[in-house]
Amino acid sequence: MANHFRTDRVGMEIKREVNEILQKKVRDPRVQGVTITDVQMLGDLSVAKVYYTILSNLASDNQKVQIGLEKATGTIKRELGRNLKLYKIPDLTFVKDESIEYGNKIDEMLRNLDKN
């Protein structure tokens, strides 16, 4: 049970740090406007699944952002190592967060129901 709290706490710290690193340290224009929405940690803290959103819904922009984040992974891990007191910095996997788009789709469906 205590391990669950640790993974949540480490995930929140990584989320905060990665957002800051993307704003201040990563100069790649492909990752401008990226917001980290959630980080899910593996139980042993070896892997962090980092969920992100972007302002654009274009597929080409999504692909560019994904490539930019993958290229910036080394820089992000290095900065995390400097800022966090962890024995081993987890491997980072970036995943586009679809929950906001899904929520918008549900809202639109509900509005359409109200009109009918």
From Swiss-Prot:
Keywords: Cytoplasm, Ribosome biogenesis. One of several proteins that assist in the late maturation steps of the functional core of the 30S ribosomal subunit. Associates with free 30S ribosomal subunits (but not with 30S subunits that are part of 70S ribosomes or polysomes). Required for efficient processing of 16S rRNA. May interact with the 5'-terminal helix region of 16S rRNA. HAMAP family: RbfA. InterPro entries: KH_dom-like_a/b, RbfA, RbfA_dom_sf, Ribosome-bd_factorA_CS. GO terms for cellular component: cytosol. This is Ribosome-binding factor A. Monomer. Binds 30S ribosomal subunits, but not 50S ribosomal subunits or 70S ribosomes. Belongs to the RbfA family. It is found in: Cytoplasm. Pfam families: RBFA. Gene3D superfamilies: 3.30.300.20. One of its GO terms (biological process) is maturation of SSU-rRNA.
